[in-house]
Amino acid sequence: MRRIVTCVIFIAVSVAALAQQDAIKGCVKDSDGNPVPGAIIKATSSSTILGYTTSDDKGQYSLSVERKGDVVVSVDCLGYESSSVILHKDTSGTCDFSLKEKRIGLKEAVVRAPAIRQLGDTLSYAVSAYTTRSDYTLKDALKRLPGIDVEESGRIKYLGKDISGFYIEGMNLLGGKYNIATSGIPAAYVNSVQVLSNHKEAAIDRNTFSDDVAINVKLNDKAKIKPVGSYEASAGYGDRWLYSAKGSAMLFRAKTQVIASLDVGNIKGFALDEGTDFLKSESDVTAVKRLAGGLSASHPPMKADRYISPSDMAVTVNAIHKVGKYSTIKVNAGYSSARSDYSYSFKGQYYDEDGEIVMSQTTTPRTKTQRPWLSLEYQKNSDKCFIRETLHGNMDFTRSAVPVELNGEMSSQSQSLNSMDFGSDFSARWRRDKLLWSVSSDMAYSASPSYSLNISSGDGGISQSVSGEVFSSENTVSAVWEKRHNRIYIPLIFNTQTDWLKTDRTGDGLTGEGNDLRVSKAVLSFSPQYEYSLRDFVLRAEVPVRGDAIWRGGDMTEYFSVCPELYLNWRLSARSTVRTAVSYSRNISDVLDFLTRPVQIDRTTLQIAPGTASDSKYLTANAHYDFKIPLSQWFVNADLAYVRNWRNQLPSVTVSGGSILNDRALAPNVSDNIIAQIGVTKQIAPIKTKVSLNGSYLHNEGRTMQNGQVMDYAGNSLVLSPSVSSHPVGWLELNYSGNLSRTSSRYEDVAKSYDSRSHEMSIRVSPVQSLILSAATENTRKQLTDDVFKTMTLLDFGLIWKHKAWKLSLDLRNALDQRSYSYTLYDSINTFTYEYALRGREVIFTAVLTI
C-alpha cells in the first residue's frame, strides 16, 4: 500500500511542478505570412537557457518554462534573419514572429546535407552520413544510427522502446515481419530513415496522444523508378560442404510495393527468423506448443551460426496496392523450412537438504520445421474513418530427434508436432457528432491434432501424445467524448476462450496416465478512462471493472476484479521526456492448471498441476526518461520498473535420480522484481564514430519449493555493454562491442556468484577504393565454478572486392578452429553448466549482384 501511495504522491508532485511552469507559445511565419517549419525557438534568462523547441509544419511552437523574471525569446532558422523579443514577467506568454529572408553571398563551397534533422515529431537520419563501404543491407545501416538499436534477432528499438510500426515510403508492406526488408533491401537504395514519435497508424487519431514510435524508410530515386533486386551465391567448406543462394526482387511505386525473396543454404539459419512477427504477442502460444517446447529449447548466449549446422529454405511474396485515395489491399505469403542440428553437454546441480543432486547429460538435437503462412488485409485509412480486416493463417510441421546420454545411459527421443492457426481481425473507428466510436473483433482458432513424444532406453520405453484445440474471441465497443483538453473513453470488452486438451502417457507399468480437459473462460470488462492532454503533458487514469467466469466440466467459478492504472507522460522540453505508470492487473487460470496426470516433457522431465485455477495479481510501477539533442547527436534513455506478484500457487520441483517433476503447490506466495536499464549513445560526427553504453540491473526475490522444502531465494544480475563503431578515415573502420556481467544467487546459507566477459572486435582496411581487408575476433571468459574459468577466442578474416554492381568476398571463419564454448547459469536455487560444440574452421566465397 505504501508503494501505491508513494507513486501517487510522485505523480501529484509532478503535476504540481507542471502547474508552476509558464507556457510560451506562438507562430513563426515569413514576411509573406507563410508558416516557417523547423525554426529553433529558444528561451533564455540572464544567459541561462530555460528551454528550446522547434516549430511544427504549421509554424507553431510551445515551450513550458519557469518565468521568475524577464525572458528573452529568440528564433533562428536557416535562410532567415534571427529575431528576438523580451517577455516581461507579468506579460502574456504569446509571442509570434515574422522572419525576414536572409540573403548571403557565398564563396565557392561544398554543401552537405545535415546528417540528422528534426521536424516536429519526426527525426530523419541521412543514411549516407553514417554508413561505410562494408555496410550492405538496411539492417547494417540501422545499426549505425545513434538512438536506434537492432538486436541479434532483428528486433528494432528506439531509445530502448520497441517500434510499433515499420513503413517503406509510408506504406505498411510487412507489418511485424520487417526482418524481410531489413535483411533484403540494400543500404545503397535508402536515402533516409525516419523515426516517427507520437505514432498513430490511423489518420482519424491524428489529434490524440500516443507514446508509440515507428520507422519509415525513404528510398532513393533509383529504387523507385524501376524494379530492383539483389542476388547472392556462396560456396565453401568446413566440417562439410557449405552453400547458399538468395535473391530478392523489389518494386516500389507510388501505389504499389512488392518484395519477393527466395533463400536457400546451410551456412546460416534464417528461415524462421524471416517469418518472425515482432508485433505479435508471445502469449499467443498454445498449451500444446508450450508442452512440446521443452525437448530441445536450450541455446547458448552466442550467435547461432557458430554452433548450429542448419539447412534452410525460405520463400516470401509480399505486396501492397493502393485502391483509391485512402484504401489499400495487402497480401503476405511465405514458406519456411528449417533444419538444424547441434550438440551440447549439460550438468545440473539441484539443491537438496541432504546434499546436491547432480545430473549430467550429452545430447545432439536434430530438428526440422516447415511453416507455410498467409495473410490478407484490407484497410481504409481516412480522416473520417478507419477500417481494417485481416485474415491470417499458418501451419507448423515439426520433427525432432534428440538422442541423449544421461548419467552414462543412452536414450533416444523423437518428437512430432503438427499445428495450425487461423484468425480474423476486424477493427473500425469513425466519428459521429461529438463522439469517436470504435469497434473491434478478433477471432482465432488453433489446433494441434497430433503431438507425440517417444522415448526409448534400456529400462523400456514411454510414449506421450497430446492433442488440443483453442477457440478465442476478443470484442470491444467503445465511445470517446472529447472537449478541449479532456477525453473520456467508455469501452466495453467481452472476451471468450475455450481450450480442449487431451494427453495420454503409455509405457511399461503405466496405466491411467491421461488428461481429458475442456476449459472455457469468459471475461466481461467495463474500462472507463479519463485523459487530460496538453501539448507537452498527458495524464491518464483508467479503472477497469472486470468479471471472469471459468467453466470446467459442470463447475463454474467466478472472479471479480478492479484493476486501476495511472499514466503520466511529460515532455519536460524539446530534449527530454518522462513517462511513468502505475497499474494493478490480474491473470486468472490457464488450461495447464488442470493437468492432474503427468505429461512427459523429455527423457527426464514430467509436468503436472494441482487441478485448480491459478490466480496471479501484479502491481507494476515503472518510470522512463529519455533525453536527446539531435543536432549534437546525444541520445540517452533510462528505465526503472518494480513488479510485485502475488500467486496462489508455489512452483515446486522434485528431483530424484534421473527424473524431474515440475509441479505447483497450493500455497500463497509473493515475488518481487526490480529492473533498471540505461542506454547512452553519442555520435562523433567529425570522425564518424558511434559510442554506446547500455546497462541493466535485475534484482529478484521469491519463494520456491524443491524436494518438499520451501525456500526463499534472491538473485542479482548486472550487465554492462559498451560498443564503439568508428570510421575515422575513408580507408579504416573499427568496431568493438563488449558484455561484462555478474550474476549472483542466495538461498538458505548458500551464496553463489559468477562473472562473464565477452569482447568482439573487428578492423576493416581499404587500401584502394574497391578492396576491403578485414579481421575480427571474439574473446570470452566465463566463470564455470568458484575457481574455474574458461577463456575462448574466435578469429575471422575476410576480403571484399567491389566493382560496379558486383561484390565478391572470401571469408575464413573460426581460423583457430575452436571447438567448444562453456557457460554457467543460476536459476533461483539451482546451477546449470553447459558446454556446446562449435563449428570448425570454414572458408566461404560469396558473390553478390545488386541491380
Regions found by a protein language model. Name each.
Residues Q20, G33, K58-Q60, E81, ...:
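Membrane-proximal, glycine/serine-rich, low-complexity loop/turn segments characteristic
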Residues K25-V36:
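Structural motif
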Residues T44-T48, D70-V85:
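A short, solvent-exposed loop/turn motif at the edges and junctions
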Residues S47-Q60:
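Short, acidic Ser/Thr/Gly-rich low-complexity loop/linker segments typical of extracellular
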Residues R206-N207, A271-D277, D341-V358, R399-G408, ...:
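Outer-membrane beta-barrel translocator domains and adjoining extracellular loop/strand segments
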Residues I320-A338, T367-P403, S411-G553, S561-P564, ...:
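Face-selective signature of the C-terminal outer-membrane beta-barrel domain
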Residues V719-R742, K752-I851:
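Conserved C-terminal beta-signal and adjacent last beta-strands/turns
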